[in-house]
């Protein structure tokens, strides 16, 4: 007696002439196919799309930077001449630089009565400050007007990624034109290291920051202190990491199989219930007629 492998077939075939098509079954089949197509396209879209997961940890992500952070500053002072505007930098490592001019540019505004300062410079990864003032001017003005608009203040590499909302330029658009002309402005910054990791594993380093500010007119025993625009910064020990991820292929296949199998099973149960109820109703009607 030869062994017949067909005995293991769990998908036994029923001759077509023994099946009975119904309008209800056709309707359920069409709805079933449309439903499966909709779910398949939804899962395919989710599989192709990249999701961004964020996490927090304590570490310095950019150890190769040499302990430096690049800063980009763009600020307009519409009532202060460019000859008077300067940038000073100092920190807890002993750095004290007055009138920083490297990689900076001054653009006259309002027919020379105002100035837009654009500069790129580096700061050490220690608490410190940089400030826009008239300290580097040859002759100090009597009443410098420090009203201003901050167009940009950003730290680290430029990071513009869709679906990532962050405070990379938190002071961009800050308008202090209606402030007291003789007031100093203190911006207290907490810089947060940020890492963005792409699907291929490439990492980009940047910095977000939170800000609090105050405005005041300062005095000493000798009289009023020359106003300035201060940016006092400190670094957060917490790093924010954004990681691009895509759903694994095996999960996509598992979900598709579940959609197809589950839909066919539920549709078969519904069709069977409707058909059984219909046949029972027909028998009841025949019994009443007889």
Swiss-Prot record:
Cytoplasmic side: 1-27, 276-290
UniProt subcellular location: Endoplasmic reticulum membrane; Endoplasmic reticulum-Golgi intermediate compartment membrane; Golgi apparatus membrane
Main location per the UniProt record: endoplasmic reticulum
Classification via Pfam families: COPIIcoated_ERV, ERGIC_N
GO process terms (BP): endoplasmic reticulum to Golgi vesicle-mediated transport; retrograde vesicle-mediated transport, Golgi to endoplasmic reticulum
UniProt topological domain (Lumenal) ranges: 49-254
Residues bearing carbohydrate: 74
Keyword Transmembrane: yes
Keyword vocabulary terms for this entry: Endoplasmic reticulum, ER-Golgi transport, Glycoprotein, Golgi apparatus, Membrane, Transmembrane, Transmembrane helix, Transport
GO cellular component: COPII-coated ER to Golgi transport vesicle; endoplasmic reticulum; endoplasmic reticulum membrane; endoplasmic reticulum-Golgi intermediate compartment membrane; Golgi membrane
Membrane topology: Multi-pass membrane protein
Segments passing through the bilayer: 28-48, 255-275
InterPro entries: Erv, Erv_C, Erv_N
Keyword Magnesium: no
Function: Possible role in transport between endoplasmic reticulum and Golgi.
PANTHER family: ENDOPLASMIC RETICULUM-GOLGI INTERMEDIATE COMPARTMENT PROTEIN, ENDOPLASMIC RETICULUM-GOLGI INTERMEDIATE COMPARTMENT PROTEIN 1
Similarity annotation: Belongs to the ERGIC family.
Protein name, entry field: Endoplasmic reticulum-Golgi intermediate compartment protein 1
Source species: Danio rerio
């Amino acid at each position: 007696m030869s062994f017949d492998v067909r005995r293991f077939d769990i998908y036994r075939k029923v001759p077509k002439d023994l099946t009975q098509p119904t309008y209800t079954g056709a309707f359920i089949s069409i709805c079933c196919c449309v439903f499966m197509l909709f779910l398949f396209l939804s899962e395919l879209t989710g599989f192709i799309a990249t999701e961004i997961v964020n996490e927090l940890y304590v570490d310095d992500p950019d150890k190769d930077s040499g302990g430096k952070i690049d800063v980009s500053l763009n600020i307009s002072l519409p009532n202060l001449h460019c000859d008077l505007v300067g940038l000073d930098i100092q920190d807890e490592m002993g750095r004290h630089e007055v009138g920083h001019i490297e990689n900076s540019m001054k653009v006259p505004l309002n027919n020379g009565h105002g100035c837009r300062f654009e500069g790129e410079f580096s700061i050490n990864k220690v608490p410190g400050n940089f400030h826009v003032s008239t300290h580097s001017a040859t002759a100090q003005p009597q009443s410098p007007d420090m009203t201003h608009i901050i167009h940009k203040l950003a730290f680290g590499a430029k990071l513009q990624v869709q679906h990532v909302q962050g405070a990379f330029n938190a002071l961009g658009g800050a308008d202090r034109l209606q402030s007291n002309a003789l007031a100093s402005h203190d911006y207290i910054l907490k810089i947060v290291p940020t890492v963005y990791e792409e699907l291929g594993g490439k990492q980009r380093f940047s910095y977000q920051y939170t800000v609090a500010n105050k405005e005041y007119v300062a005095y000493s025993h000798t009289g009023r202190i020359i106003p300035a625009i201060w940016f006092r910064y400190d670094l957060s020990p917490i790093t924010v990491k954004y990681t691009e991820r895509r759903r694994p292929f095996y999960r996509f296949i598992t979900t598709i199989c579940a959609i197809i199998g589950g839909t066919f099973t539920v549709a078969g149960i519904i069709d069977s219930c409707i058909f059984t109820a219909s046949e029972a109703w027909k028998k009841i009607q025949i019994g009443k007629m007889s």
